[in-house]
């Protein structure tokens, strides 16, 4: 489903058994590269000794895989402070339907195949700019549909700190319909020094 509803005939791939490793943690840069079947709590347990965590804190963190969270553009209770998945994914390595493995990331670093995809999507964004401006939901936690506004941000929060384009953000929220993820490069955050619970 593209918006969270049930699906009819579909292919569901469970990566959580064989495709769940932490491939790299760069403490200095505050990044981690992971396979899509890794469960969020398992990642955060490995990051805790480094004083880091992945701040997209969904309530199902004991079961939620990073690939599934990316596919859904998951948020979490602290998304107002940290953003949702699209704000915390720096890159993705993914297979296209042709079987070609492509690196998705900052536009300035794209290889020829990814640059061609970026050019095509940018053309769509320009062609439909008026419709995007008129109809794109102006909400902080938009989690449904393709992020066609990566070239002309319509989100209240910029996708990147410097406003640059990151093609990996096109895959976030696409629920695997554009490519099949091999790995994700994630932006980490320092562990909070204190936590507060407010009850209304």
Stretch-by-stretch model annotation:
Residues 21-25, 31-200:
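FAD-binding subdomain of flavoenzyme oxidoreductases
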Residues 1-19, 34, 55:
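Glycine-rich N-terminal segment of FAD-binding domains in flavoprotein oxidoreductases
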């Amino acid at each position: 489903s593209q918006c969270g509803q049930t699906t009819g005939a579909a292919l569901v791939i469970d990566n959580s058994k064989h495709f769940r490793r932490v491939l790299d943690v760069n403490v200095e840069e505050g990044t981690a590269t992971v396979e899509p079947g890794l469960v969020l709590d398992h990642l955060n347990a490995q990051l805790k000794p480094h004083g880091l965590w992945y701040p997209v804190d969904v309530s199902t963190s004991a079961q939620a895989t990073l690939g599934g969270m990316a596919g859904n553009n998951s948020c979490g209770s602290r998304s107002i402070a940290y953003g949702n998945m699209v704000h915390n994914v720096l890159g993705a390595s993914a297979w296209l339907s042709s079987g070609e493995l492509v690196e998705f990331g900052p536009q300035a670093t794209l290889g020829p195949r990814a640059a061609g995809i970026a050019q095509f999507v940018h053309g769509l964004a320009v062609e439909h700019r008026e419709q995007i401006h008129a109809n794109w939901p102006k909400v902080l936690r938009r989690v449904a549909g393709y992020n066609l506004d990566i070239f002309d941000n319509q989100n209240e929060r910029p996708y990147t700190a410097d406003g640059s384009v990151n093609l990996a953000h096109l895959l976030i929220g696409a629920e695997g319909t554009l490519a099949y993820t091999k790995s994700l490069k994630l932006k980490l955050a320092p562990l909070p020094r204190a936590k507060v619970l407010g009850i209304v």
